[in-house]
């Protein structure tokens, strides 16, 4: 039922016969960016997990935190890409006067916010990763890709 409700914006957009406008172009760009970001983030995560599984199988230490590629700029770029997709669909529907479609994207955003918290709590419970992940949390944006910040309490090496 939840997935059907989330898909209602697609139905709404395709049920109206209107010519394309500027907002459709904006929505298309947002949706495509979301798909590309989610794809590359998920691919990078898969490669990270696979590499760590190989290292673990060889008895070597694993890398505690994925902080390269898109993961350098935010802690959950895959979720960011997914959010771009859903909010892009809202832009499509909104331009057709179907503003109610934002409800699905909003519910999805709230669910991912909750899942984000669960994932991060799980990372902090793993002793081998907790310290590195705390630094990663302090220096890296949660969802929206942004520049790194310096962790508080860590002195600059050049000072």
Label each PLM-derived region with a short phrase:
Residues 1-5:
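Specific transmembrane helices
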Residues 6-44, 49, 53, 57-159:
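Hydrophobic transmembrane alpha-helices
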